[in-house]
Swiss-Prot record:
Keywords annotated in UniProt: Cell membrane, Coiled coil, Cytoplasmic vesicle, Membrane, Transmembrane, Transmembrane helix, Transport
Compartments it resides in: Cell membrane; Cytoplasmic vesicle, Secretory vesicle membrane
Pfam family, one: SCAMP
Membrane topology summary: Multi-pass membrane protein
Protein name: Secretory carrier-associated membrane protein 2
Coiled coil location: 50-87
Amino acid sequence: MARHDPNPFADEEINPFANHTSVPPASNSYLKPLPPEPYDRGATVDIPLDSGNDLRAKEMELQAKENELKRKEQELKRREDAIARTGVVIEEKNWPEFFPLIHHDIPNEIPIHLQKIQYVAFTTLLGLVGCLLWNIVAVTVAWIKGEGPTIWLLSIIYFLAGVPGAYVLWYRPLYRATRTDSALKFGAFFFFYVFHIAFCGFAAVAPPVIFQGKSLTGFLPAIELLTTNAAVGIMYFIGAGFFCIETLLNIWVIQQVYAYFRGSGKAAEMKREATKSTLMRAL
């Protein structure tokens, strides 16, 4: 017969002092300690420590340099102000880069609408250099072939006088005219550029005026030399072609500059300035 349980919801009576289960014995395993970190007693860290006197000396040295820079800056500013008051512009030579001879900075100094004209004018200046150099070469060959040393000396004179003369007389006035928009500078350019065009046209033809025209590589001496020495005649024809191209570029430049000169009202301004200067001289 089954045992009767008076209260099925009552907790079971357990004797805490009774030995119900056996506890497994503890193992003999243990945690191994970490190895000690290496310690280098001889390792040192060098920390530069300046003495108070050294710091003061360096501070005084830096202060002296700063004062010197301020003094130089003030002196430079004073000179720039004095130059600005007198209207003198210092032009640093920067062209050509390998051996600067002139000041030339079209992108930064010439207005954008005049840069094309200025570049083509500069091309005509370089073109004149090339024409006169080729003229020296061709005339030298003609001299070797028996034409005499006089024409060679004249070709050297053309180059030595023509290149710097062109820069001083018409290219620099045009450069300054486009940079400052000066009517008088434009007038100087027009006056001397007309002579430049006339010389290039004369050289392209080279009529027998000076030593039968053989000191210049023009068409007329080229035709004459072609019958006696074909190589020299061809060189003269090439030189004549160079002078023709130079003349055409010169005509384009003076037309463009004159169109700007008239369109901007500089012609009337130039007349007023010329009249004013004439009256001042008369007074």
